[in-house]
A protein has these predicted regions:
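Nucleotide-sugar-dependent
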Residues: 110-120, 125-149, 156-166
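Nucleotide-activated donor-binding/catalytic signature segment of Leloir-type glycosyltransferases, i.e.
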Residues: 39-123
């Protein structure tokens, strides 16, 4: 089962909710899951200020400074769920495909032009929609629900805010299946 997330660079607090989950799944279900992180991007600039002179300089970010590197560490448990060889290749930040990556526990998908963004949904079976409880997130749209539905993907969503509008939990309290459910809703801990 391929479990994927796609989004932008402003979702660190949302993705931190997933911390520890890839490792627990990969330990208990070895070879049955793949986590797919879509949108990996190393573009960006950093502006630095010299404290003594007040002069500002702007430079390209280094790969390890990218928020996507932090996202990847969440999805790979700091590269523990992948082989050392694959982890080293990932941390070399080479664009392109790694041989056999479709069968590995984690897969990085580089950013694509906005006109082909939706094609990323073809790379996974289950869409993740974690969302941090915060007033800003409470009033967001349910875009992830709409995208998953449009692409006929199963959805695991946070039981919060915008996802409570259209999502009906497919599993009731106690584990009973809800035949009217359209999503797996997960409580924030």
């Amino acid at each position: 089962v391929r479990i994927g997330w796609l989004g932008g660079s402003s979702h660190l607090k949302d993705l931190e909710i997933l911390s520890g989950m890839p490792g627990r799944l990969s330990t208990s279900c070895t070879g049955k899951f793949q986590f797919v992180l879509c949108g990996y991007d190393l573009r960006g600039k950093i502006t630095e200020m010299n404290q003594q002179t007040g002069q500002q300089t702007t430079r390209d970010i280094e790969p390890h400074e990218s928020i996507w590197y932090t996202y990847e560490k969440i999805f790979t448990e700091n590269y523990k769920i992948v082989s050392k060889e694959y982890g080293d290749w990932l941390q070399s930040f080479k664009k392109g495909k790694y041989k056999g990556e479709e069968e590995l526990p984690y897969r990085r998908v580089w950013t694509k032009p906005i006109t082909t963004y939706a094609s990323n949904y073809n790379l996974f079976d289950v869409s993740l929609a974690p969302i941090k409880e915060h007033v800003f997130n409470y009033v967001k749209s349910q875009l992830k629900v709409i995208e998953a539905g449009f692409h006929k993907k199963a959805l695991i969503a946070q039981d919060y805010g915008p996802y409570q509008i259209d999502c009906i939990n497919a599993v009731e309290y106690g584990g009973k299946l809800n035949s009217k459910g359209n999503c797996l809703m997960v409580e924030t801990r």
